[in-house]
């Protein structure tokens, strides 16, 4: 079994994907175990001495001024989980929940949360035995962290709630019993430590940014096919043009396109057919590149967040102190996820306009809507409608969630991030972008049917042939949703990158 070792400091987004999607085993490092035990000693001492510490011997939120007796500290934590299990909506996908559990375990592994070692080990065992809590997708304000959804995760740990196990939705108690995992009784501070963090938005964020990195490379490849089908001008992709405005993403996108069309007889030079192309072709490096740079920034934000202690209060065992702070506030992730939605929407925006240039005979020398029997057949006409619909939907979804805030807990928690809403929206935007690119891939491949007799580029030809393995050329009208879905699957499966790699073309 392949393993990911967590220590609270070195988890990567790639590690998250390995655990979430590929079901790699999670192992807690020995150093992390020592830190967890050391941190727990401070909590036990404070409880024994009867010190007043938020979340350990007090209530929560506006009830932080209510002192809880030593005898009631365990009941306090159980009540916290029960009362906070208020999330609603459809269950989050399994891959997201597995990522959530991994990120929470990694945050606890830093040793600033004061939980018992057995509690962290229970969470890890649930990951390894694929006990997946049913976590409804809606209900988080993104500060204090993802309280409501994370409470549903903890319900299963204490033998309540619901979970998916072995393909069935069962009670949390049954899932734990069938997996052979003992349920736990929460001790002082543990309920709070398990739910007061940004792990839901961060889990969504990690999967979003991982997929976005793939999509931007695919967008370069798909745009290259359109460039070729429209006999675009390669001069705009010259490295010298990029180097006098040396944004890294722009340089990479131009390089990717040059790789794709190498050897093409369809690609033209400036002045050969046209002096210059429309912006949707000529500015591919500038637009795609800016999105690539945005994704790199977002990746850095998440890289910090997934290796952070995000609960409250924090235990500093070396100093013997417990400090209340605000690391649960999801603003860094909220802004990053809103940025991701905006950036990805631009990929769909420019892709849809390239689709229009492919189907609009007034903008090219191809048959209207890429069908030879126009009138009797509508060809690719309505595929562009679908792309336009998705682009417009993305414009709504890209309205930032982070600009909103509603005070809660009797105005004690008077500013929140809405980071999980931002992350959920970004996931939907990503699906729409992938579909728009699938429509462009389908449409550009159809356009190439009218460019017979010209040699295609090394990369574009390979992808064209990949499409034709799944989708026949459009001769007469048929149900295009089948073709769109086939191209969507080609993109999502990673086959584009695989076949290009076989040709020695490595997209960055």
UniProtKB/Swiss-Prot annotation:
What processing steps or modifications follow its translation? Answer: Contains an active site 4-methylidene-imidazol-5-one (MIO), which is formed autocatalytically by cyclization and dehydration of residues Ala-Ser-Gly.
InterPro entries reported in the protein's UniProt record? Aromatic_Lyase, Fumarase/histidase_N, HutH, L-Aspartase-like, Phe/His_NH3-lyase_AS
The pathway that the record names for this protein is: Amino-acid degradation; L-histidine degradation into L-glutamate; N-formimidoyl-L-glutamate from L-histidine: step 1/3
Q: Name one GO molecular function term.
A: histidine ammonia-lyase activity
Respond yes or no to whether keyword Signal is given for this record: no
Q: Where is this cross-link: 5-imidazolinone (Ala-Gly)?
A: 143-145
- Tell me which UniProt keywords the record has, alphabetically: Cytoplasm, Histidine metabolism, Lyase
E.C. number, please? Answer: 4.3.1.3
TM spans (from-to) = none
Q: Where does the UniProt entry say this protein principally localizes?
A: cytoplasm
Q: Where in the cell is it found?
A: Cytoplasm
Concerning Gene3D superfamilies, the annotation shows:
Fumarase/aspartase (Central domain) (1.20.200.10), Fumarase/aspartase (N-terminal domain) (1.10.275.10)
Q: Which positions carry 2,3-didehydroalanine (Ser)?
A: 144
Catalysed reactions, as listed in the record? L-histidine = trans-urocanate + NH4(+)
Q: Name one GO cellular component term.
A: cytoplasm
Q: What does the record list as GO biological process?
A: L-histidine catabolic process to glutamate and formamide; L-histidine catabolic process to glutamate and formate
Keyword check for Ion transport: no
- Alphabetical list of NCBIfam families matching this protein: hutH, PRK09367.1
Q: Which HAMAP family match?
A: His_ammonia_lyase (MF_00229)
**What family is this?**
Belongs to the PAL/histidase family.
Report what the protein is called: Histidine ammonia-lyase
Record gene name: hutH
